[in-house]
Each structure stands twice: as C-alpha cells, then as structure tokens.
Amino acid sequence: MTQMADTEAQDATLALLAARAPGTTICPSEVARALATARSAGGDQVDWRDMMPTVHAAIDQLVIDGRVRLSWKGQPLEARAGPYRIRRAAEP
C-alpha cells in the first residue's frame, strides 16, 4: 500500500459517508468498489476485493484520527475485527 492509495481510500470513505444521510453507515466493500471503479475508469482493471487491504488500513487510520467510528449490528466496536460498518465520528 502506498501513501497515495491510503489517502485515496480515506478520501473515498469520507466522501461516501458525506453522501449518506446522517446516522447511516457504509460497508468497507463500498469503499473498495468505489476505488476499483475509479481505477478501472482510468484504464486499470482492478478487482474491488484486491482493494480491501488498502481500505482496511485507511479505516484503521481514520479510527485512530477520530474521524470515523465502527460498529456491527448496531453495537460499537473499538477497533476493526471481523465484519464491521463505518459511520461518521460525530454521530451517536
């Protein structure tokens, strides 16, 4: 993973959250799909699954920075483990 890919994944995460109604969450695979689509449009054929390690690392940093929070089935998660959803940090 490069710093550029990490920043791109963080930006995509925050953009997807900004496009959603307050209180809603996104799945990390949505971020990976958005990144893969953008790269494929640029001429590279990228499978979204290949983007998941980059997305996970970006999410970890966003959690550390306090910009997003994680949950699963409505219960908060302190750190990424297993399946999870992402929401804005400013929301309950």
Residues of each region from the PLM?
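Alpha-helical DNA-recognition elements
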Residues: 61
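Short, cationic-aromatic polyanion-contact patches
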Residues: 74-92
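Positively charged, polyanion-binding regions of nucleic-acid-associated proteins
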Residues: 4-29, 53
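A short, conserved structural fragment
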Residues: 64-71
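A general secondary-structure junction signal
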Residues: 30, 72-74
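Short, conserved active-site loops that position catalytic residues or coordinate cofactors/metal ions
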Residues: 27-38
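Short, positively charged loop/turn segments that connect secondary-structure elements
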Residues: 36-56
